[in-house]
Amino acid sequence: MFLKNLQIKNFRNYDSLDISLSKGTNIIYGNNGQGKTNLLESIYVLAFTKSHRSFIDKNLIKSDKESAIIKGTILNNIPYNLEIILNKNKKQVKIDNNSVSKIGTYIEKMNIIIFYSEDLNLIKGFPSERRKYLNLELSQISPNYYNTINDYNKLLKIRNDYLKRINNGEDINQSYFKILTDYIMEKSVFIYQMRNKYIERLNKVCPDIFKEITGRDGFKIVYSPSINLENFEKETIRNSLLEAFNNNLEKEIKIKSTLYGPHHDDFDFVLNEENLRNYGSQGQQRIAVLSLKLSEIKILQDYKGTSPIILLDDVFSELDHQKKNNLLKFIDNDMQVIITTTDLDNIDKQIIDKSKLIKIDKGKIVEEVR
């Protein structure tokens, strides 16, 4: 899989950009503030329909413009023309000029893995950061997961609204409230099972990568659902959720929010039974996240039968020589890699010699080699 070309209009600091990309390694370079990270962000938006840097789509539109457009051609046995149109109040998603209503179907067309400075938030950040990670990775594997988590969030909002109404003393349709809770449990079963299966798959790959980099055993990812589960069988999950809902309804009404379900899940990075969030050095944390991201490559290859596109946003300046080599040896020659950097000296000469070089200045290509 690779991104053949990219067209951007009115995105961040870009008026207009049309760029052809190499099937191998591409290096986007230039001074700070010229648009390198914005360029990678546009590729991320093209893949996921949303940004990893902003929750608000209108922030992606160039100031004083009404809309932004991102287009790209993905080659994966057959070509797909993907397009995102961002307006201030809505978003259009297209495949081959046809509008797409099910975003899950769109997301599976283009698989990417991004390495960037905020990756440490996967360990240091809030549980919501880790849930977001799980949701995005599983959505690349399964369109059904994306659709299910979206349905779950809509149902959750409705249930929380009902809890607020009960708290305010309003009469509600009790039968509908029960049906709503049943629907939430049904969606939860699928989400719990998919997340557990993904964590299990990570733990077949991630510890070996961590050991190869550090020489240390005992690394694992530990899934922490918001309910106590002896196993992930359908009936076990349903019964545990039902018990949690029944035993805590008064508390939920009091705080006007659903207390149990996948929206409160978390996972931890553990080394020799110690949580790296609390006890790991920053070096260990970086290697743990690096191992996680490298594991994603293998998992996507196994599930999709093709390699994802790798985005490296100025990460070489933060890695020592050994970590750079550890990263690069896990990236196959047949993968498309798009790297940003402020200084070509941060990248080994043998990589530069086989790469397409693109210099960006003030949102424009000013030099292109190969």
Regions found by a protein language model. Give the residues of each.
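Conserved P-loop NTP-binding catalytic core
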Residues: 11, 15-94, 152, 166-167, ...
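Post-Walker A helix-loop "phosphate-sensing" segment adjacent to the P-loop in P-loop NTPases
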Residues: 45-57, 295-303, 334
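Walker B catalytic acidic pair
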Residues: 313-315
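Structural motif
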Residues: 95-96, 271, 361
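Structural recognition of the conserved hydrophobic beta-strand(s) that form the central parallel beta-sheet
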Residues: 72, 336-343
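Conserved NTPase motor "head" modules and their coupling/switch loops across ABC/AAA+ ATPases, GTPases
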Residues: 1-31, 171-309, 318-322, 326-329, ...
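An accessory alpha-helical subdomain
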Residues: 115, 121-214, 224
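Nucleotide-state sensing region of NTPase/ATPase domains
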Residues: 47-123, 127-129, 133, 138-141, ...
